[in-house]
Amino acid sequence: MLAAIALSAALQNAVQANKTPAAEIGVVRSGKLIVDDAYGMADLNRHVAATPQTQFEIGSVTKQFTAAAILQLKEKGELNLTDPLGKYVPEYTQGKDITLEQLLWQVSGVPNYTEVNHFQHIAGSTPGGVDPALALIAKKPLDFKPGTRFEYSNTNYILLGAVVARVSHTPWETYIRRNIFERAGMSHSGFIQDEPRLPDTATGYARAKNGKLQVAPPLHGPWAGAAGGIVSTVADMAKWDAAFFDGRVISAQDVALATTAHRLSSGKSTGYGFGWFVDKKAGQPEIAHSGGTFGFASENEYFPTLHEFVIVLTNVAALDAGFIADQTFDAINPQIAALENKPAKGEDPAITALARQWMHRMQTGDIDKSQLSSAFAKHLTPQMIGGMKQGLAPLGDPTSFVYRGKSKESGSTAYQYSVGFKGARLDLTIAIDGHGKISSLGIGSE
């Protein structure tokens, strides 16, 4: 009883520390949903409190469902993962030779339609769908030769949704509802375009540049579609996780395939399977995906050696869901969390000082491109710099900076750190090339 009270207090503190309007938090341990609690306000203006029945947009966690749909059709013999995209979506001529598995693995080179200029305005003011999404990138060449590198693109899964619809002769949403929601018992899930008819959908918020919350811009559901269009609850997401990993949605063999990180021809792991990232948190194997829309963020995390799931749904477009998931993991695994403050061996103080400097630069937007490789300097657009500042500045100064180790990546050495803040923890990766220039920076929740 006391442990449950302490856990509830820790979770409520996590939500309040991040100033999250509302969060629904779930913990599944050994097949039982032991935590399904809601905190905060689903609608600030109308003073509606969040409950376990409140529905949230899950964003890119939707990709797990789309990948499962493709694998179901593969199991029925209706498609092959090595089929070329042109067999199903011939109108996208640049991608005609890309295979379905390259889309699933995010190694296709297809440009990301959600990164075009003014996308937020477009997606809130015009009807969406596969055709409008493809129109945004129709004149763009592939970003790289398919199969040669990993680069996350929402377009990959919009295209896979089109494949599901055309092979099954039914809209993607209808297919997901009939073949996944109903099979898993997900009676409180739907799609963004259903929200006006759903009784308990939260209002989404975004943080303005001054940090204040404001109602998020509108999003026409089909713009998110198969890449991020599902609305759900923690209880339903727990049902999805159970059905998926128990082999009730796809075969056990395909579950293993979907949750195994792909390796490029170079042997380098991409850290991504079919709609699932494959990584570690606090030294524990983790199979997970995060999600975000204009006004929501989510985390769906599975720790196979611990037999635990952590599910977090929030109604703010920020890093809050990842922070809260970290704090939830720490609260239910205090002994493992204690190990997070022990640095790895072989730390280089000069590199750590550089990493600290660049954490501050990302928070302030003060980017010195002379320290970057030419390729990375070109890649780091003003929009990306502004986005980093907006997301990281509210965290304040780091309270801890722990070295986690290093690895070789494409001619560079990548150094990993766990960076603590008041109420949050992030992973920071800084890669240094052979000329001493920063070739990449990675930031995310642990």
Give residue ranges: language-model regions:
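Short, small/polar residue-rich loop motifs at catalytic or cofactor-binding pockets
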Residues: K19-A22, F294-A297, A424-L426
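Exposed beta-sheet edge and beta->alpha loop/turn motif
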Residues: K406-E446
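Short, well-ordered beta-strand elements
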Residues: H289, E299-V316, L428-T429, I438-G444
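Short, conserved catalytic-motif segment at the N-terminal edge
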Residues: S8-I58, E78-D83, K139, Q214, ...
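Short solvent-exposed beta->alpha transition segments
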Residues: D366-S410
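Short, glycine/proline-biased beta-turn/loop segments that scaffold the active-site neighborhood
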Residues: L81-G95, A184
